[in-house]
Amino acid sequence: MTLGGVGYGTKIDYVQVSHSGDDAYEWFGGAVNAKHLISYRTLDDDFDTDNGFSGNVQYAVALRDPLVADQCSCSDSNGFESDNDGSGSTALPQTSAKFANVSIYIANGTVDKKYRSAFRIRRNSALSIYNTVVNGAFPKAGLEL
């Protein structure tokens, strides 16, 4: 589900994305709030924020298959991925979303080599994550800044 510049007047509640060929949820700017999100067996990232997204996301779960990951040479698979923009500039508004009450699960077994981090927060992002649990191993890092 890709959201570009969606404002806070929009309500997103009880949405499931399954078997996505890219990110389950990606926000490019905007300030929309979302609740009760499920990401199931997606290829790329579960929750990806960019370009000044400043909304709040609460009550989300990601269920990952350890053998299903993005095989593109230009990408890898993360629970969270967040950038201010592609170059890491100080452009405003800054990506400053807040996530709370999130659970990420990777099933037991050998994890595909394209998995990277549970939390990949980079390029001048100011993402905040509260009360969140990860169950399973991301091979590169749990938290990558």
Regions found by a protein language model. Give the residues of each.
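Extracellular beta-rich repeat passengers
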Residues: M1-D22, E26-L145
